[in-house]
Amino acid sequence: MKLQNRIELLLMLREYLEENGEEWQMVKHTASIHNGWFTQEFIDLSVKNIIEEFLSQDKLTNWVNHYHLDDAIVPKNVGIVMAGNIPLVGFHDFLCVFISGHMQTIKLSSKDDILLKHLIKKMYSWEVTLQNYISFASILKGCDAYIATGSNNSARYFDYYFSKYPSIIRKNRTSVAILKGNETTDILEKLSDDIHAFFGLGCRNVTKIFVPQGYDFVLLLQSFNRYKYFADHHKYRNNYDYNLSIQIMNNRFYMTNETTLLVESDALFSPISQLNYSFYSEIDGLLSKLKHKKDIQCIAGIDVPFGKAQCPELVDYADGIDTMQFLLTL
């Protein structure tokens, strides 16, 4: 299949998503029932980002031109193990392999095995030969290369099975934010989006903030109030109640707006419903320290503006590993 045909199919997919017809709405509803974390709001947020950042004709064209893609590639079969922490989280890997001209065999997460499968089957209906390029499997074997995303534990498993092949293996990552103390209400509300979107389950969600000594948390806590409706989501509420009880039982100081906990901790990762914080005295030293932390996906307020952590562009490759360059060397 020629590059131009692949681009045209992606633009058809964009149109299908934008139309948001009854069929697609039903699929999204089914996905939200299958996984209680995949609310309609957050499925739509994922789709919006895909439409605007990944399937824009101009952005696709610039991306393709940057790598000088053409039809000369010798197709290899790339196995993709997808995560399932947020809706359509594996779309970018699918897109990279597809636009490169390679074939792919996808192992979907049981948490997110409805949305992407439907979209690819829809693409089959537009171009039947696509079935020769994209397939699904419950077990991956016999592929020429692998891209696998999972927890630190599953990464050891991936290393064992895939290390003898060309591979990208991704582990747990999270994101942090640095505040200077002079942020406006509008900026703090954007940071609140970076924290709360997808219930904080994404690797680009902010789970830890660094604030200057003497920081006043009142405005920050108030900015969280736009997500107070999380208290009505039973899975989130169960996590909040549990984490609150941990703080109380351990007699630890905490702050809360009754939906999100603020806890002083050195840990970068925080459990659902909790945001960790630490104080800093000198920002340059803090930045130098954070740049060497392999667990950090991005730093809101530094790498990306507040409110944009969940809006990665085509070239914002997970873990800083250029997926397209990897594929072009196969």
Say what each PLM segment does.
Residues 66-85, 137-142, 152-154, 260-274:
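Donor nucleotide-activated moiety binding/catalytic core segment of transferases
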Residues 199-330:
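NAD(P)-dependent aldehyde/semialdehyde dehydrogenase
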Residues 109-112, 171-175, 313:
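Short, acidic/turn-prone active-site loops that include or flank metal/cofactor-
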Residues 90-91, 116, 155-160, 220:
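Short glycine-/acidic-enriched loop or helix-start segments at secondary-structure transitions
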Residues 61, 86, 153-155, 217:
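Glycine-rich nucleotide phosphate-binding loop and flanking beta-alpha elements
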Residues 1-79, 275-287, 296-309:
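N-terminal Rossmann-like NAD(P)+-binding subdomain of aldehyde/semialdehyde dehydrogenases
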Residues 63-126:
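Conserved small-residue-rich beta-alpha loop and adjacent elements
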Residues 77, 127-215, 271, 318-329:
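Conserved NAD(P)+-binding/catalytic subdomain of aldehyde/semialdehyde dehydrogenases
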